[in-house]
A protein has these predicted regions:
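ABC family nucleotide-binding domain
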Residues: 1-203, 208-210
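Alpha-helix capping and helix-coil boundary motifs
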Residues: 109, 223-224
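Conserved switch/coupling elements of ABC/ABC-like ATPase nucleotide-binding domains
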Residues: 211-222
Length: 224
C-alpha cells in the first residue's frame, strides 16, 4: 500500500496535506494523532471510500484513482478488509450470514460463502454462535464476527479503525491477540487508534499524524 503526496480538501479545510507513506506486505502499522488530524480521512482514502483531491493511492499494486466507482467497490470487497469500532453488523442477519455476505457480494456462491464463513468463525472460536443475531452477542463476539467478515475474501490489506474502542478491557485484549496472530501469519495491518497500548502490542511501526501530514515515524518494540 502506498500514498504519494495525497491532498484532501473539503471546501477551505485541508484534511490531508501532502500525505505520503508506504506499507509492505506483512507490515503492521499503527496510526495515531489528535482528533481532526486526518487519521480517519487517511483510512477512507486507503479503503477507497473517498477520493483524494490530488495525489495517488495504491493498494495491492492498483492505483485506486484509475478505477470507476463500480470497479472501486469490487476491488475494495476483494482486496481490502475493514474492521470498525462499532462493528457495523447487520442486525437482521445471524452471525454466519453477516460473515458470508461479504463473499456473496463478490459473486461467490451462497454455499461456498457459508462454508468459508463457518471455517472463519470456527478459527475465531465462535462457531457455536453462528446462528445468533448481533444483539445477543457480547461486544467481543461481535468484533470477532466483524473480523471474520473482514477476512472472508482473504484481503491483501486489513484496515482497523479503533478496533477495541467499544470493548471492555478483557474483550479488547482478546481482539489485540487476534490482530497479533493475523499479522504473524502474514496479514498486512493498518490500525488507526488513540490507544498507545494497542499500538505497541499490535504494530511494529508507528505513524504519528498532525495537520494532515506524517509528523513522525518510528519503530515500536513489542509490549506484553
Amino acid at each position: 500500500m502506498r500514498l504519494d503526496g495525497v491532498h484532501k480538501e473539503y471546501g477551505d479545510a485541508k484534511a490531508l496535506d501532502g500525505m505520503s507513506l508506504e506499507l509492505r506486505a506483512g507490515d503492521a502499522v499503527a496510526v495515531m494523532g489528535p482528533s481532526g488530524c486526518g487519521k480517519s480521512t487517511l483510512l477512507n482514502m486507503v479503503a477507497g471510500l473517498d477520493r483524494p483531491t490530488s495525489g495517488a493511492v495504491e493498494v495491492h499494486g492498483q492505483d485506486l484513482g484509475k478505477l470507476n466507482e463500480t470497479g472501486l467497490a469490487l476491488f475494495r470487497r476483494r482486496h481490502i478488509g475493514m474492521i470498525f469500532q462499532f462493528f457495523n453488523l447487520i442486525d437482521d442477519l445471524p452471525a454466519l450470514d453477516n460473515v458470508a455476505l461479504a463473499a456473496q457480494l463478490t459473486g461467490t456462491s451462497a454455499r461456498q460463502s457459508r462454508r468459508r464463513a463457518l471455517e472463519l468463525l470456527d478459527e475465531l472460536g465462535i462457531a457455536d454462535r453462528k446462528d445468533t443475531y448481533p444483539a445477543a452477542l457480547s461486544g467481543g463476539e461481535r468484533q470477532r464476527v466483524a473480523v471474520a467478515r473482514a477476512l472472508m475474501n482473504r484481503p491483501a490489506l486489513l484496515l482497523a479503525d479503533e478496533p477495541t474502542g467499544a470493548l471492555d478491557s478483557r474483550s479488547g485484549e482478546q481482539v489485540m491477540d487476534l490482530l497479533i496472530d493475523l499479522n504473524q501469519i502474514g496479514q498486512t495491518l493498518l490500525i488507526v487508534t488513540h490507544d498507545p497500548h494497542l499500538a505497541t502490542r499490535c504494530a511494529s511501526r508507528l505513524i504519528e499524524v498532525a495537520d494532515g501530514r506524517v509528523a513522525r515515524e518510528s519503530a515500536l518494540e513489542p509490549s506484553a
